[in-house]
């Protein structure tokens, strides 16, 4: 069953566009939306300015949580909730840029383009994921631990 749930989680990641990312710092909790991409291990990547609050919070406290919701009004609820750790990734990461540009329906950058423009890449490594798929399971969440 865990394999099936992991595949359903991947489907949500494939269909989604924005992730709501929750962080915490000395000022309290904070949430922001970021455009994300993912890999086959369910790791989630995004670009952000390293000086914004959520990026600074990750440096101070790498424990994060998030949600990705696919459904809209009148549709069955579909999405994921997760917790894990996040960190900044060094480098231009052209491989990530290609996926990110494709997701945003932009032309592929050239390998030597400055795709970050002052931003940095970040990775979220989920530890627990809860799937909400009302069509298949009602409101009985399915969970996987990674």
Model-identified regions with their sequence ranges:
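Alpha-helix boundary recognition
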Residues: 13-14, 59, 102
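Short beta-strand segments
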Residues: 16-50, 58, 64-69, 78-81
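A short, aromatic/hydrophobic, helix- or strand-capping loop or linear motif
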Residues: 23-25, 69-71, 108-116
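Short, solvent-exposed aromatic-acidic interface loops
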Residues: 49-53, 102
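Charged, gly/pro-rich active-site loop segments
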Residues: 78-146
């Amino acid at each position: 069953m865990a394999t099936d749930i992991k595949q359903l989680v991947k489907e949500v990641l494939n269909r989604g566009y924005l992730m709501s990312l929750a962080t915490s710092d000395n000022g309290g909790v904070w949430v922001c939306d970021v455009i994300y991409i993912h890999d086959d291990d369910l790791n989630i990547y995004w670009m952000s300015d390293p000086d914004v609050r959520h990026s600074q919070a990750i440096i101070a406290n790498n424990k994060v949580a998030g949600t990705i919701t696919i459904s809209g009004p009148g549709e069955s609820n579909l999405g994921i909730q997760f917790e894990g750790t996040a960190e900044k990734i060094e480098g231009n990461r052209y491989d990530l840029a290609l996926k990110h540009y494709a997701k945003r329906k932009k032309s592929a950058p050239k390998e030597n383009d400055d795709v970050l423009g002052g931003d940095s890449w970040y990775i979220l490594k989920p530890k627990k994921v809860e799937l909400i798929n009302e069509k298949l399971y009602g409101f009985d969440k399915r969970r996987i631990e990674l």
